[in-house]
Regions:
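Glycine/small-residue-rich loop that forms an oxyanion/phosphate-binding "nest" at active or ligand-binding sites
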Residues: 68-108
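Charged helix-capping and loop-helix junction motifs
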Residues: 122-128
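Active-site rim beta-loop-alpha module in soluble metabolic enzymes
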Residues: 147-205
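Acidic (Asp/Glu)-rich catalytic clusters
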Residues: 23-27, 48-61, 100-101
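Conserved, mostly hydrophobic/aromatic
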Residues: 9, 63, 109, 223
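C-terminal domain-boundary segment and adjacent tail
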Residues: 140, 232-251
Length: 251
């Protein structure tokens, strides 16, 4: 039976602020991307998130972002590649400390927000982030947008990479995501989103915002856990994949 991973972003609370439905979502995903303190999260939340993943048998990933707590890491920055590389190494190391304490491996690394989108298009920045991930624990996998510069950069240095697709995001004809705030950026209708996930999993294609067909490699599907219908949405995606003959399993 073919399989696909379901991943979600986790541990985005910090201080007095609670974001997401972490404990409720985890039983239905197979890997999680934990914020490492730069765009969200704090040491206590990181520790709690790792322990929650261990409880539910979910693979732990680092989710490093730009140093932008106020903007939730979604604002682009003119950051030098060497500085971004150091920032990502720092964040990976912080999460690995909690993984080591909990006795679980650091399975993967997925950049967050603006850093994710910038590295998807910028080959120099992508190469810098791939070097940071390669310096991480042995066998840590890069999780990156399908067809992006990150995937190319990882392949160029022999870094293991899994290609990611999105359940609730619109695509442009070049395979990039429709920018947040633009028309078609978010797929609001659950049935439409689920149908797109099934198509990506079975056929490796998705319809772009201009009506063209984009070819994708779908190793993992990102599902967001911070919306009011997040839990039911994840449950429905998991059930639909199983009904279509696709197992849900970590990459």
């Amino acid at each position: 039976m073919p399989s696909i991973d379901l991943n979600c972003d986790l541990g985005e609370s910090f201080g007095a602020y609670t974001i997401g439905m972490d404990a409720e979502i985890l039983p239905y995903v197979t890997s999680a991307n934990i914020a490492c303190g730069f765009h969200a999260g704090d040491p206590s939340v990181m520790q709690k998130s790792v322990l929650l993943c261990k409880k539910y048998g979910v693979q732990v990933g680092a989710h490093p972002g730009l140093p932008d707590l106020q903007g939730f890491g979604r604002r682009r920055m003119a950051i030098p590649p060497a500085e971004a590389e150091a920032d990502v190494m720092y964040q990976i190391g912080a999460l690995k400390a909690f993984c080591d304490a909990a006795g679980v491996p650091l399975h993967h690394v997925k950049p967050h927000g603006a850093l994710y989108n910038m590295t998807a298009r910028d080959p120099v920045l992508a190469a810098a982030i791939c070097r940071a991930v390669q310096a991480a624990p042995p066998d840590a996998v890069l999780l990156a947008l399908s067809g992006s510069e990150m995937v190319k950069a990882a392949n160029a240095i022999g870094l293991p990479v899994a290609s990611e697709v999105f359940a609730d995001r619109g695509y442009q004809a070049d395979g990039s995501l429709v920018p947040r705030g633009a028309p078609g950026a978010m797929i609001e209708d659950e049935d439409t989103a689920i149908a797109r996930v099934l198509q990506m999993a079975a056929q490796g294609t998705v319809q772009a915002d201009d009506g063209s067909t984009v070819t994708l490699q779908a190793d993992s599907v990102c599902v967001h856990g911070d919306g009011p219908k997040a839990l039911s949405f994840v449950q429905k995606i998991s059930a639909a994949l199983l009904a279509a003959g696709t197992a849900v399993a970590a990459f």
